[in-house]
Design a protein with these regions (language model features):
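Cell-envelope/ECM-targeting effectors and their regulatory/trafficking segments
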Residues: 1-165
Length: 165
């Protein structure tokens, strides 16, 4: 594979997604390999010790995929991504990152900067295990998320009581 300035394709869009997710912002995510995409590719290549020619051959593509896999894995572990862990920054991967950022009070810009990575790689160990009979703010948080996903929490909605509904 070889992607160069002037190309227009879905692969270019996925390249742009990947670059943006890794904080090498190509500005547009439209599948058009323009000057900004070339500059982002060069910055990425330089940072990874690759030949900085702005062209995306197998070496650059495979390195990009290997950098995306940990993000996909973390997003999948957090329940935001349900696709294949393949390193391709497709629409589902990119949208999962933006949704994760939005849900966690982060800037939803699709760039996995330090704040996003810190939040993505932490576990919520300070939250209690919820079970039938549990009450409180964590139950409300769970119920609210379930309702948002289209599930019913009984006639009372998010009432803070973990019941049969």
């Amino acid at each position: 594979m070889l992607l160069v300035e002037g190309n227009t394709s879905t692969q270019v869009k996925y390249l742009q997604h990947g670059l943006r997710m890794l904080c090498f912002n190509p500005k547009r995510l439209d599948g058009v390999f323009d000057t900004n995409t070339t500059l982002a590719v060069k910055r990425y290549q330089t940072s990874r010790g690759l030949t900085s020619d702005g062209k995306v051959g197998d070496g650059t593509w495979n390195k990009l995929k290997s950098d995306i896999i940990p993000l996909q894995t973390s997003l999948k572990n957090k329940g935001y991504y349900s696709g294949t862990i393949d390193g391709v920054a497709g629409d589902a991967t990119y949208n999962a990152l933006v949704k994760f950022q939005s849900d966690n009070g982060l800037t939803a810009d699709g760039m996995a900067g330090q704040s996003t990575l810190d939040k993505l790689h932490t576990t919520d160990t300070n939250k209690p295990i919820l079970q039938l009979g549990s009450t409180g703010k964590y139950v409300i948080e769970l119920q609210t998320k379930l309702i948002k996903l289209g599930y019913s929490c009984g006639d009372t909605g998010a009432d803070g009581v973990f019941g049969d509904d």
